[in-house]
Structures are given as C-alpha cells and as structure tokens.
Amino acid sequence: MSPGLCFLKEISVIQATPKPTTRSFANCCKMGILQHLMHILDIPGFPWKIVIAGFSIGKYAWDLYLRRRQVPYLLREKPPAILAEHVDEKKYQKALSYARDKSWFSTIVSTFTLAVDLLIIKYDGLSYLWNITKFPWMDKLAASSSRFSLSTSITHSCVFMFGLTLFSRLIQIPFNLYSTFVIEEKYGFNKSTLKIFVIDLLKELSLGGLLMSVVVGVFVKILTKFGDNFIMYAWGAYIVFGLILQTIAPSLIMPLFYKFTPLENGSLRTQIEELAASINFPLKKLYVIDASRRSTHSNAFFYGLPWNKGIVLFDTLVKNHTEPELIAILGHELGHWYMSHNLINTIIDYGMSLFHLFLFAAFIRNNSLYTSFNFITEKPVIVGLLLFSDALGPLSSILTFASNKVSRLCEYQADAFAKQLGYAKDLGDGLIRIHDDNLSPLEFDSLYTSYYHSHPILVDRLNAIDYTTLKKNN
C-alpha cells in the first residue's frame, strides 16, 4: 500500500470514530509524514555509500576552506588598535604562531580521519565490526529462548559500540600525544605527564564504556519494544539521562580527573558569596580544581540543580587573575544563570533531539541504506543510528551556524549583565588577560567565526561593554 493510501485509510478510520481526539489526528499526521519520508528515502539500489562519502568529503573541503580564509589573520604583524596598549607584540606573534601550528595540525588530523572514514565506507567496516563482535554464544542464547533475544541484541550492540569507540580512540592516540607533548609543550601549556595521559585514557574508556552501555541498552530496548512508536519514549529517555548526567558529572565524574578543594575562607570567597547573594543565586558549594596538573589553560563554571548550585574555579584562573577580575568573570557566568541561558539552551537541545528522532524514524527501516553498507540479513538499530548521523551531516553543519549565533548572543547578554553590576572594566581586563594567557588569536574571518565560535571575538566583546571609554575614564 502506498504512503498516500495508508494516510487516507488512517483518516477514514478516524472519521468513523464517534469522537476523534486531537491526539489521534496528530498521530495520524505524524505517521502519514513518516510513511511518506520512508517511501522517498528507501529507493532500491540508491547509492548511499557514495552520498555519505560525498558528505564526508564535502565537510572536509568546507573545513579546509574556512581555515584558508583564516590564514591572513594569522599572518598580521600588529594587534588590533583597541588592544595595542594591552598586548605585548612578542606575545601577540607567539599567539599567532600557536594558532598556525594548531591549524595545520588540525588539517593533518582531519585528512587522516577522512581517509579512515572513506576506507570504512568502501570496505564495509561497520558490517565487519558487527560480525566480529557477534560471539557464537549470542546466537545460541537467543535461539534457546525468546526472552533472551532482546538481551543478546542489547549486548551485541554495546560490544559493537565499545569496539568502534576503542578503535576510534586508539587511532587518535598518536595525534593526542603530539598535540599534548609537542604543540602544547612548545608553548608552555602542558603540565601533564605520560603517566597522567595513560591513566586519563583508561578512565575515559572505562567510564565512557559504562555510560555508553547504559545509553545503548536503553535505546535498543525502546526501539525493539515500541517499534515505529519509539520517538516519544526515546526522547523521554534522552531527557532523563541528560538531567542525571548534569547532576552527577561534577560530583561523581569530574573528581575522577580533578581534585576538588573548597575555596579557602578569605576576601575572594567573601566577595563571591556576596555576589551570589545579591542576585539570589543559590550557592551551596565553592571549589577550586587542580587543572594546573594537566594544563595552564583556565576556566570557571557553575553546576547543580535549580535550588542547589556550585561554582568551580580552575586554580590557573585564581592564580593568574586579580580578585576584581575574578569577581567580574563570575558576574558574567552568573549572568547566564540569571537570564536562564542554560534553560533556553536545554529547551533548544531537547527540541532538536526530538526533531532528529523524528527524522531517524524515517531511516530506521530503510532497507536500501542497510543494504548499501552490507547489512543484508540484519538491520541493527544502533548501526542505523550511526548511518543516520552520517547522512545528517550537511544539516548538522547548517544548524551549527544557528546554534553558535544563539550562543554568542547569550555571551553578549552575560557581558551586559556583568556591566550592569558595575564590573565592565574589570571584566574587560579579565577577558584580555584570559586571551593573553591562553595565547588566543585576536582577529578572525567573519565566516570562520560564525561556524566555529560559540563566543564572540575579544574585540567585539570589549566594544560591546564600552571598554575603551571606561579605560580612559579610569
């Protein structure tokens, strides 16, 4: 039956019902659209391999194009006029050299990654990995009883995903080592050791494997149990898992990598507590973490449930900034909370995840997609999700512009909030110092910024808070 006839049949059933509900009509529309999408996308013999390989090559070419546009900005001799008196020219040239090194290294890594991806596509790497991770006992157990069939499917999917993740991490190790112990070391950022590097890698693989097993297991179970009606159940699971992860990450996961120490009593702690109290921020915990064990880069963030918040400061941030600068930076961070930016971003994320699940529903039964990648007899849902993600590449790239635009708007608003609190000059000083300490470039191509940057560039942020005027007046 064609999608159109199926849709008409569903309409006739609803019309025959004495009291049709809004929900049933919505479901009808949803299923009609899904059936239509399934029909359009599932074309026998459609060259999905060529299409997805083309998307990968296109993404690679796009990244190269943007990096090429940025090159002239990395060859400039002097900093922007607004920063001329704040930035040492030797430090400025060092920052540009650091950016150039990272840019060419990123090109090498992305070239290697593209080559691996194309080889996996050409030689049916996913199908091969699926077959070798299917141990004989799985088939025997599934055949012995129907109640074991779902369990073996979940186990197989988890083993497959762990194998894929392990492969991806292992082939990236040489690049990670070079980035950490050559590039970061060259510019004075690296404080890590080979021992710390290996321990962190093992922790990441172990923790990642555990979390991934939970996510994959729940996802496969939902799709197996609810079939084509999985969307809302999977979306609900995504929301619940995200909330749990946000809650436990600072207290259970991050302490595996960093030592959390309560900020000692003193002037800084008192000022932070007074700032939090002035805007009714429910501050319960205030920590400093030993980020300097791995790097000299700095950061700060807040976390927690709406009624129980904590603030985390990198020790590098505390060490390198004056107290007024630290308070101004935290004024910016708390501005995100005050204006509900996290909530807004969460709602956007949940909305996009629902949209992606709706699109995925049109791919999940796509025979031509699975067949193109040599999945003839089996159509694992976890593989379908991976292939769907690859097919969604161009849309994801387009959405990156929108998400970064929203993020930059939030950053401007948080800066304005700190300015309203009277911290504009100190915030400007702090931002300049952060960029100086992190050897961040000061000028960027506009298209490059639109695609890659979730934060406005420094010059634009300083202009937005009238930093130059405030500096002259002081």
Swiss-Prot record:
Entry keyword Metal-binding: yes
Binding site for Zn(2+): H332, H336, E411
Annotated cofactor note: Binds 1 zinc ion per subunit.
Cofactors named for this entry: Zn(2+)
GO molecular function: metal ion binding; metalloendopeptidase activity
Protein's name according to its UniProt entry: Probable CAAX prenyl protease 1
Location in or out of the cell: Endoplasmic reticulum membrane
Transmembrane regions listed in the UniProt entry: 103-123, 196-216, 230-250, 344-364, 381-401
EC code: 3.4.24.84
UniProt organism field: Schizosaccharomyces pombe (strain 972 / ATCC 24843) (Fission yeast)
